Design a protein with these regions (language model features):
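N-terminal membrane topogenic signal
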Residues: 1-12
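Single transmembrane alpha-helix segments in multi-pass membrane proteins
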Residues: 21-76, 103-113, 189-199, 254-258
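Extracellular/periplasmic helix-loop junction at the C-terminal end of a transmembrane helix
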Residues: 120-153, 184, 277-281
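Alpha-helical transmembrane segments within multi-pass membrane transporters and channels
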Residues: 78-122, 263-267
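Hydrophobic alpha-helical transmembrane segments
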Residues: 10-11, 32, 37, 62-65, ...
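Residue-level recognition of pore/gate-forming positions within transmembrane alpha-helices
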Residues: 39, 68-69, 91-95, 118-123, ...
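Helix-loop-helix "hairpin" substructures at the membrane interface of multi-pass membrane proteins
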Residues: 155-234
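Transmembrane alpha-helical segments in multi-pass inner-membrane proteins
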Residues: 61, 88, 208-282
């Protein structure tokens, strides 16, 4: 029976189900509960790279923000009335982008890798901020809508929360299977001693690239949901500071523990929202 209590999938699922009454108990909104789950997905995805592969990226806000913009633009301009298809297409685009950025960034290692990802984040922010007629620039991008899905009106905040909850559970399941697979064991070996892993016969660069791409994929899932949370997005989603926030979530909860990043998202957003009730400038 004790194995059930130690299973991170079960624990995080239960925590997710308790999240809605917890936020209501603290006087916060259902929107906040949904935001916590979205950032928990992003942090868990980022932690594939940080906690399991041992690489520090300062550019993962790129994948969150680009997925958000892609989902928004696809829905508003190409697929009004749809939500799942724009999300899927945006995640696919973000994954390909992650593969490209990972291929270029992983030519370097250590602090140079981190600085290169930071440079990509700064460049992406500049492009989105300046590409006014396509992204809205400093005014941001709006016009997104939540349609009815399988007869359920997603404009209802509780219904939208449970949609995000289902995605969260699926992501937790997939990442849990991933990190506990032989592939996950190789990533851990690379994190502990990449030279030794190379001597054993593992292609370290290939595994790091796969890890980077998978991390971008899961962060992209979080980003694809975000524009439908508040019906608006801004260029700050791809800013270096936002990448730093995603990094902070993993570190705050504990990057060496599977559940740590999700708990980091919970503590960070709850603290931010509760603090805003007592200060006027948060």
């Amino acid at each position: 029976m004790s194995t059930y209590y130690k299973n991170p999938l079960i624990i995080l699922t239960v925590c997710g189900l308790l999240l809605l009454p917890l936020t209501e108990l603290t006087g916060l909104t259902t929107t906040t509960a949904s935001e916590i789950l979205i950032y928990a997905i992003a942090a868990l995805g980022f932690n594939i790279l940080l906690g399991y592969t041992g690489l520090v990226s300062f550019g993962h806000g790129i994948f969150f923000g680009v997925a958000a913009y892609a989902a928004s633009i696809i829905q508003v301009k190409l697929m009004p009335g749809f939500i799942i298809t724009p999300m899927i297409l945006s995640v696919l685009f973000t994954t390909i982008l992650g593969l490209g950025i990972g291929f270029l960034s992983l030519r370097l290692s250590g602090v140079y890798f981190s600085l290169l990802t930071l440079s990509f984040a700064a460049m992406t922010f500049y492009v989105i901020y300046r590409w006014t007629h396509f992204t809205g620039g400093e005014d941001g991008y709006g016009g997104m809508e939540r349609p009815t899905l399988f007869g359920i009106d997603l404009n209802n905040q509780t219904a939208f929360f449970y949609m995000v909850m289902l995605i969260f559970i699926a992501v937790v399941f997939l990442i849990n299977r991933l990190v506990n697979s032989p592939f996950g064991s190789v990533l851990t070996a690379i994190r502990e001693n990449s030279q030794r892993a190379s001597f054993i016969g593992y292609d370290v660069k290939k595994y790091r690239l796969i890890s980077f791409t998978l991390s971008a994929f899961f962060v992209g899932i979080a980003g694809s949901i975000f524009p439908f949370l508040k019906y608006y997005i801004g260029a700050e989603l791809v800013h270096v500071a936002h990448s730093g926030e995603i990094l902070a979530l993993s570190i705050l909860g504990g990057s060496r523990h599977f559940m740590g990043p999700a708990l980091g998202a919970l503590f960070f957003i709850l603290f931010r929202e509760l603090l805003s009730e007592y200060t006027s400038s948060w």
